[in-house]
Amino acid sequence: MKINDFFAYIEEQVADCAKKERALIAENRKDEANMERIKSNVYGIAKSLCQVTEELAKKHGLDHATMFVDKLTAVMAPWKASLTAAKEHTDSEKECIELIKLETADRILEAWKR
């Protein structure tokens, strides 16, 4: 995916999450609204990582695509560890949060690779 298309995808997803969040709040569904906010935050993290890795790749003559995937994967590692801990401690709320973060990051990686 071209970088401008990727940024457009991210912005579209953030806007969609915000729209869903507002609708859920209006329906007094706060927990579900919080999940949309979490997704939006992950998209924001990915956008920031993409911008930073693009600059670093240019500066150091490295492959931007590989660098972005590596950095996003590194960000996901603590989420995976937290998910494992949540499962071990039967913390269903934390488990749900970590799953949403990881699923969103996986969607981002899939979009990036298109």
Could you say what each language-model-derived stretch is?
Residues M1, L49-D70:
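Intrinsic disorder/low-complexity detector
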Residues K2-K20, K39, A65-K80:
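Short amphipathic alpha-helical heptad-repeat segments
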Residues C17-D31, E54, S82-T90:
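Secondary-structure edge/capping motif, primarily at the C-terminal ends of alpha-helices
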Residues K30-V42, S92-E103:
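Short, charged, amphipathic alpha-helical segments
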Residues K39-K58, A105-I108, W112-R114:
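Repeat-associated, polar segments at repeat-unit boundaries in modular proteins
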Residues V75-R114:
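Amphipathic alpha-helical binding modules
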